[in-house]
């Protein structure tokens, strides 16, 4: 593995490079190396790097937009696939990398045109190709390219996050994940944020897709609900996402749906949890799904004079 030439290393703590340089030490076994984690803080945000990706979030964070401060989410479009094509990390077992580039290009054009069916279908093709790089039973297996995607992807985003934090006074990194960062700062500094992101895009070749967030309730990087300017709420995580998942009918979590409904209503609209629960007449919101076995052998049925008692 070779660090990218267009990486601005001055924004990345040297300890991060020391962590990844351990891969050159042949006395360290693969099992020990790839289980390793490196932790650091960017202001209030704890961040973890490793061989599975980067993630970080301010824990138990609740925030609402004010007239002076805002939150912006900067996500890289099809990040890992573009790392393959732009940085030359495509599997060396593909006869012609141009085939993969053409598929990715078609996917991005479909997304821009609003063709969700084509975009989502090709997204699966593009993203699973990265996973194949690290699957020894797949014909696309190429661990060098797979590790290169993962390491370089983390370093580019860490550089962007550190640059924003060091350059803009009072900025907070709210969240940092495998394909983007979320920042909170003064609205007067938005132009500086935009300039930093524009330079990063120009230098790396990646495209950032920006969203504005007016409210967020975040437990951690994997569990949060955010509200966009149009009032639409986006939730992630087992605490808040129930029912049939957008991914399809095979992704179903219909157990205790009322809990997620009540939590979202509280965080998004300020509705007391008790009000949401007591006003719900849909019995399926209250069902509990459990796997039969030694742990759940019996069921106690309780009935009361009134369904509200």
Where do the protein language model's features map onto the residues?
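Conserved "right-hand" nucleotidyltransferase catalytic core of DNA-directed polymerases
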Residues: 1-82, 163-201, 206, 210-216, ...
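Residue-level signal for secondary-structure boundary elements
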Residues: 28-32, 92, 112-116, 134-138, ...
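Helical catalytic core of nucleic-acid polymerases
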Residues: 44-167, 174, 184
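Short acidic, glycine/serine/threonine-rich loops at helix termini
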Residues: 84-86, 220-223
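Short, low-order "capping/linker" segments at domain edges
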Residues: 222-231
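Charge-patterned, long linear interaction tracts outside catalytic cores
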Residues: 270-301
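Conserved small/polar residues in nucleotide/adenosyl-binding loops
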Residues: 302-309
């Amino acid at each position: 593995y070779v660090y990218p030439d267009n990486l601005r290393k001055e924004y990345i703590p040297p300890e991060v490079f020391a962590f990844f340089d351990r891969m050159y030490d042949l006395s360290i076994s693969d099992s020990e190396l790839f289980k390793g984690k490196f932790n650091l803080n960017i202001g209030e945000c704890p961040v973890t790097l490793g061989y599975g990706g980067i993630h970080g979030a301010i824990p138990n964070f609740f925030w609402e937009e004010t007239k002076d401060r805002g939150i912006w989410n900067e996500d890289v479009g099809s990040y890992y696939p573009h790392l393959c094509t732009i940085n030359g990390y495509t599997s060396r077992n593909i006869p012609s990398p141009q085939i993969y580039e053409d598929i990715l290009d078609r996917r991005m054009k479909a997304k821009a045109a609003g063709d969700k069916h084509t975009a989502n279908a090709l997204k699966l093709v593009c993203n699973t190709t990265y996973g194949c790089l690290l699957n020894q039973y797949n014909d696309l297996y190429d661990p060098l390219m797979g590790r290169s995607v993962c390491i370089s992807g983390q370093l580019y985003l860490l550089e962007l996050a550190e640059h924003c934090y060091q350059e803009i006074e009072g900025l907070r990194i709210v969240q940092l994940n495998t394909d983007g960062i979320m920042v909170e700062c003064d609205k007067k500094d938005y132009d500086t944020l935009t300039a930093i992101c524009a330079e990063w895009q120009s230098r790396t070749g990646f495209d950032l897709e920006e969203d504005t967030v007016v409210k967020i309730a975040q437990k951690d990087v994997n569990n949060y609900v955010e509200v966009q300017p149009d009032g639409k709420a986006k939730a992630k995580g087992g605490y808040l996402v129930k029912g049939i998942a957008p991914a399809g009918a095979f992704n179903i979590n219909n157990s205790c749906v009322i809990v997620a409904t009540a939590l979202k209503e509280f965080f998004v609209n300020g509705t007391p949890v008790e009000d949401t629960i007591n006003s719900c007449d849909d019995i399926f919101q209250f069902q509990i799904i459990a796997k039969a076995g030694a742990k759940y052998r019996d069921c106690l049925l309780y009935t009361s004079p009134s369904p509200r008692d």
